[in-house]
Amino acid sequence: MTQTLPAGLTATATVAASSANLGPGFDSLGLALSLYDEIVVETVDSGLTVTVEGEGAGQVALDSSHLVVRAIEAGLRATGCIAPGLVVRCRNDIPHSRGLGSSAAAVVGGLAAANGLVSQTDWTPLTVEQLIQLSSAFEGHPDNAAAAVLGGAVVTWTDGAGAQARYAAAPLRVHPDIHLFPAIPQQRSSTAETRVLLPDTVSHTDARFNLSRAALLVVALTERPDLLMAATEDVLHQPQRAAAMPASAEFLRVLRGCGVAAVLSGAGPAVIALSTEPVLPAEAVEFGIANGFTIAEMAVGDGVRWSTGVAAGR
C-alpha cells in the first residue's frame, strides 16, 4: 500500500561534505567535514520545480534527473509514500567534482529530506541503517555516504556485489588534537574518470602494505595522531592517479616533505592534510596558494540532520 503525501508539507535537510579513502583506506574509510549543503523540499499538488544556489548553479539539471530529486523520490518509495509534486531548493556550499563527497551529500540530503516529509505522516521514516544502505547503493561504495549519514570518521564495508550488495559502517571518534585542512583546487575531476586509471589487480606486497596502513590509520585517527604520517601512506590508488592531477600530486609531495600527513581527498583533485599543529607550514601554504588551492581549516562534520518545515538557515 502506498500513501500519497498531501500538499503543503515542508522539510529541511543539512548534510556534510566528506573525504574518502584518507590514503590507504580505499573505498572503506571516510571522514565528514564541516562544510554543508542544505535542501528544502515542499510537497505540492503536481509538477516539479528545482532551484540551485551556490555550487552547481547553472550547471546541474533542474529536472527529475537531479540527484537530490532522485534521492527524495527513492526515499519516499522506500517508506511507501509518493508525492504528486515537489518544490526542491538546494543551497550548495560543497564544491562539485573535487573529491569532497558532493554526490554523496546530494543523495544523503535527499533521503533525509524525504524522512522529514514522511515524519509528518503516520508512516515510518528510514532508519540510519537504511539511509546508509540506500545512499551507498546510489554511490556504489559506502565511504562518503556513511560519513555523510553518521558524521565523524567511519569504517565501512560491503557484503556481496551488484544489486545484492549490503553496506554497513562503524563510527570512529576522531582524536581532538587532529586539525583538518582541506585544500581545494579549481581543477575538477570525476571519480569515474580517475577510477579507470586503477589496475584491476594488485600484488600481495602492495595489498599487505595498504592493509597495515589502513589498520594503523584507525589507531592514528582515534588514539595516536603521532602515527598519522605512516598511517596515511598508500600504494594502491594515489600514485596511479598522480598523472591526471599533477598539481595535487606535487602539493602532496610538498606537504609530506614538510612532515604533514596529507592525502588525496577521495578521488581528488582536492587534498586534505591531517595535522596535530594548528597551522600548516608556511612553505606548504605558499605552494598551495601559488598553485590555485584554497586552503582552510575545517572541523569534523556532523551527521545529516533533517527537520520539518523550513529551517532558519545556517
Swiss-Prot record:
NCBIfam families: thrB. GO terms for cellular component: cytoplasm. It comes from the Bacteria. Catalyzes the ATP-dependent phosphorylation of L-homoserine to L-homoserine phosphate. Belongs to the GHMP kinase family. Homoserine kinase subfamily. The keyword Transport does not apply. GO terms for molecular function: ATP binding; homoserine kinase activity. It catalyses: L-homoserine + ATP = O-phospho-L-homoserine + ADP + H(+). It is an enzyme of class 2 (transferase). ATP binds at P95, H96, S97, R98, G99, L100, G101, S102, S103, A104, A105. It is found in: Cytoplasm. GO terms for biological process: threonine biosynthetic process. This is Homoserine kinase. Its main location: cytoplasm. Pathway: Amino-acid biosynthesis; L-threonine biosynthesis; L-threonine from L-aspartate: step 4/5. Its EC number is 2.7.1.39. Keywords: Amino-acid biosynthesis, ATP-binding, Cytoplasm, Kinase, Nucleotide-binding, Threonine biosynthesis, Transferase. Gene3D superfamilies: 3.30.230.10, GHMP kinase, C-terminal domain.
